[in-house]
């Protein structure tokens, strides 16, 4: 006789907004449309977004990812190369021009806005203070918009305390778009305390999607026995969500790329799980994780939503006459 084993009850607090932002959506669409328009291969400099699932999905369609332009073989120089959503230093398109490469720039428009803010500070004679994480592609790209020696990178309040600029009365700051809103506010406050004449950018540099995802996690995390963020270990905004969940009161918070990474033996007795996804994490993985919990629990999904995002960024002019179908994006959005 078969005896049915009841599953333990579980509430999943599903955060909204979550996952792809308009800049990530646009960048992926650019690669997909370039493949439809020009055929494979399409080269992409650096990961188009920081997510292996997305990268592997595009590779399956015919994209080839490289770190430098000199990796593109001579016989493929006529094929397009796409610059990633994180932005690139000015030297990269200059190098592409010197090699007679046709390139499509998938830099997020909000990152491009930070570039313009930094260049405006520089044009007006201010030394630029960039708040961001050393080595991140976006930071490398922003610093690469300016002449060497005209920008200083600050990561923490402690960095501010030891910062000694040549002209403390002539500084302007910008920030990486994917930082912790609260941490960045602390760094800016200390900068303003030390340098009262510090000039702010004309608009907030941290992007709407970063802010929205952090705000809903703050609301959903209290009372969660476990909070799961879908994202890659090299995704800045995803890692910030893990930190935000812990600070907001989640007992435990973890970053996973796939459901297979969840350590079920380590979960313990849980009643409430929070679930969000970084701006470069596809919805198909969120659904995969929900199904993994439903296999083990009698799970009820509750939507924790703050705002509905309606932002949409146009793709490059060269690609706007190419039809983008639901099937083209099913590998990340689901059917």
Curated annotation (Swiss-Prot):
- The active site of this protein is located at 138 (proton donor)
Keyword Calcium assigned to the entry: answer is no
What are its cofactors? [4Fe-4S] cluster
Q: Where does isopentenyl diphosphate bind?
A: 50, 86, 136, 235-237, 280
Q: What is its EC number?
A: 1.17.7.4
What NCBIfam families does its record include?
ispH_lytB (TIGR00216), PRK01045.1-4 (NF002190)
Q: What is this protein called?
A: 4-hydroxy-3-methylbut-2-enyl diphosphate reductase
Organism listed in the record: Rhizobium rhizogenes (strain K84 / ATCC BAA-868)
């Amino acid at each position: 006789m078969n005896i049915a084993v009841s599953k333990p009850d579980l509430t999943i607090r599903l955060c909204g907004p979550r996952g792809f932002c308009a800049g990530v959506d646009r960048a992926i669409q650019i690669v997909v449309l370039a493949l439809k328009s020009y055929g494979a291969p399409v080269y992409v400099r650096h990961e188009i977004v920081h997510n292996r699932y997305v990268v592997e999905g595009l590779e399956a369609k015919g994209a080839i990812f490289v770190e430098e332009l000199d990796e593109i073989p001579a016989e493929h120089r006529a094929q397009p190369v796409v610059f990633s959503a994180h932005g690139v230093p000015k030297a990269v398109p200059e190098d592409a021009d010197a090699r007679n490469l046709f390139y499509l720039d998938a830099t997020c428009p909000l990152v491009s806005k930070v570039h313009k803010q930094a260049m405006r500070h520089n044009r007006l004679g201010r030394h630029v203070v960039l708040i961001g994480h050393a080595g991140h592609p976006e930071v490398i790209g922003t610093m690469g918009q300016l002449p060497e020696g005209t920008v200083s990178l600050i990561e923490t309040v402690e960095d501010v305390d030891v910062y000694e600029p040549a002209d403390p009365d002539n500084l302007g700051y910008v920030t990486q778009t994917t930082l912790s809103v609260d941490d960045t506010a602390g760094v800016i406050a200390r900068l303003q305390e030390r340098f009262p004449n510090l000039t702010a950018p004309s608009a907030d540099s941290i992007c709407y999607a970063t802010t929205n995802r952090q705000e809903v996690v703050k609301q959903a995390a209290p009372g969660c026995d476990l909070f799961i963020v879908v994202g890659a270990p090299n995704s800045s905004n995803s890692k910030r969500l893990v930190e935000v969940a812990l600070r907001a009161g989640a007992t435990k918070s973890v970053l996973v790329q796939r459901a297979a990474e969840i350590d079920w033996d380590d979960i313990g007795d849980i009643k409430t799980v929070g679930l969000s996804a970084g701006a470069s994490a596809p919805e198909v993985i969120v659904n995969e994780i929900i199904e993994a919990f439903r296999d083990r629990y009698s799970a009820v999904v509750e939507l924790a939503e703050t705002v509905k995002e309606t932002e949409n960024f146009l793709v490059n002019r060269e690609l706007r006459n190419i039809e983008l179908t639901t099937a083209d994006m099913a590998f990340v959005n689901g059917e």
